[in-house]
């Protein structure tokens, strides 16, 4: 939710018993701290880390620095969330949107859309030390999402054609020896 009146946007959730039909959980809601520009908080992404800890990434900005970022929160139960250092801080005001996350062959990938272009960062560590690749753009244009299917990394995004959504785009990614992704459309 992005708040047009400047008030802090709540982080909410929906729940499902079957993964198909969802209902709003009206008992769950929280706000980011004043460290962040609360009105722009949106696009939460939750990632389990294998040790029982959940990580949430939220699109926002650092209030004092006026830099876009992905706030990083952690939880042991997906109910109570604690803010830690942002997982990514953009070089300017643009906010990294619609984040995604991938582990493949011992490399970790943080995926997001910045200024309408899909981008990624990579690391040997799951939640820090992000490197910018030689070419950070994902050739799926906006809002790239990935899935590992039969061992293959498939990205889907869209070409907006002047509006939101539009033509769906796909690309397959391969992990290079240095961890950078190589793409084939």
Where do the model's predicted regions map?
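Carbohydrate-active catalytic/glycan-binding domains of CAZyme proteins
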Residues: 1-185
């Amino acid at each position: 939710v992005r708040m047009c009146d400047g008030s802090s946007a709540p982080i909410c959730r929906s729940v499902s018993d079957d993964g198909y039909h969802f209902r709003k959980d009206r008992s769950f809601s929280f706000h980011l701290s004043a460290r962040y520009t609360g009105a722009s908080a949106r696009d939460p992404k939750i990632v389990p880390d294998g040790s029982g800890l959940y990580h949430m990434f939220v699109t926002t900005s650092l209030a004092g620095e006026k830099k876009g970022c992905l706030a990083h929160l952690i939880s042991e139960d997906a109910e109570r969330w604690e803010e830690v250092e942002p997982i990514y801080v953009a070089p300017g005001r643009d906010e990294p949107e619609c984040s995604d996350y991938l582990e493949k062959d011992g490399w970790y990938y943080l995926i997001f859309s910045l200024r309408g272009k899909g981008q990624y960062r990579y690391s040997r560590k799951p939640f820090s030390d992000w490197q910018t690749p030689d070419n950070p753009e994902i050739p799926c244009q906006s809002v790239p999402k990935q899935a590992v299917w039969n061992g293959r990394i498939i990205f889907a995004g869209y070409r907006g054609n002047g509006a939101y959504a539009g033509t769906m785009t796909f690309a397959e990614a391969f992990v290079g020896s240095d961890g950078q992704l190589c793409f084939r459309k």
